[in-house]
Amino acid sequence: MKQNIKLGVIAALMLIVLTPVTSNAMHIMEGYLPVKWSIAWGVIFIPFFLVGLKSIGKIVKQDPKKKVLLALCGAFVFVLSALKIPSVTGSCSHPTGVGLGAIMFGPSVMFVLGTIVLIFQALLLAHGGITTLGANAFSMAIIGPIISFLIFKALKKKDGNNAMPVFLAAAIGDLATYTVTSIQLALAFPDPSGGVMASAIKFLGIFFMTQIPIAIAEGILTVIVYNLITENGEKSILENNDKGVKANEC
């Protein structure tokens, strides 16, 4: 437990130090993408969102208590993704937080939770935008969780410490998000001489200067929260939720 606390403090300090007081937008800001790309990413995103809604409905129907853990995973995404570092013009770097929910519930749940976070931040915090919601959701709420889930599933141990699989899942999922964002920006703004590939490499180079340390810090925080939930947190949260429901009924 003491080791977890120490690691948590270190990771939190890394995020605080790397995050300035002011920043611009989440991933790709409002109006930055050409209309055709905004529409295209929105169309691609919608089927994933519908699958996510169905998945959440199934989880809640099977075990209503899981709503608390779903909310916790959503809050984790909201808090981490609110920390921003200006990076490429029209975009920024930040933790994503989607790995935790993908590991615990599967990637489809994060299709919805990640999108809800993006909508709230676009409307309330002026981070990101509605016209770029499809593109931002595809990178952070879809690709990031899928990669995190696949890595955790491939590396997890049935009996043993899963700290490293969780760390790698969260960190690489974070980096995957920004790899996709770089490709999205490159498709919209190809290099005049080198085309899409050259543009993507440039975006990746700028993003990863800030994103690699952020991904490491996110991986550490995700391990700590995951351990707290799986070791004793889940039971405690569900029990507290039951008490709250009973109190309201009285």
From Swiss-Prot:
Keywords: Cell membrane, Cobalamin biosynthesis, Cobalt, Cobalt transport, Ion transport, Membrane, Signal, Transmembrane, Transmembrane helix, Transport
InterPro entries per the UniProt record, alphabetical: CbiM, CbiM/NikMN
Signal peptide interval: 1-25
Biological role stated in the UniProt entry: Part of the energy-coupling factor (ECF) transporter complex CbiMNOQ involved in cobalt import.
Intrachain disulfide bonds: none
Record bears the keyword Nucleotide-binding: no
Similarity annotation: Belongs to the CbiM family.
Encoding gene (name): cbiM
Record's bilayer topology term: Multi-pass membrane protein
Subcellular location: Cell membrane
Any matching Pfam family: CbiM
Any one GO molecular function term: cobalt ion transmembrane transporter activity
Pathway(s) it belongs to: Cofactor biosynthesis; adenosylcobalamin biosynthesis
The protein's name: Cobalt transport protein CbiM
Transmembrane segments: 33-53, 68-88, 100-120, 132-152, 163-183, 205-225
Cellular-component GO terms for this entry: ATP-binding cassette (ABC) transporter complex
Entries under PANTHER family matching the protein: COBALT TRANSPORT PROTEIN CBIM, PTHR43627
Domain of life where this protein originates: Bacteria
GO biological process: cobalamin biosynthetic process
Record note on quaternary structure: Forms an energy-coupling factor (ECF) transporter complex composed of an ATP-binding protein (A component, CbiO), a transmembrane protein (T component, CbiQ) and 2 possible substrate-capture proteins (S components, CbiM and CbiN) of unknown stoichimetry.
Organism name: Clostridioides difficile (strain R20291) (Peptoclostridium difficile)
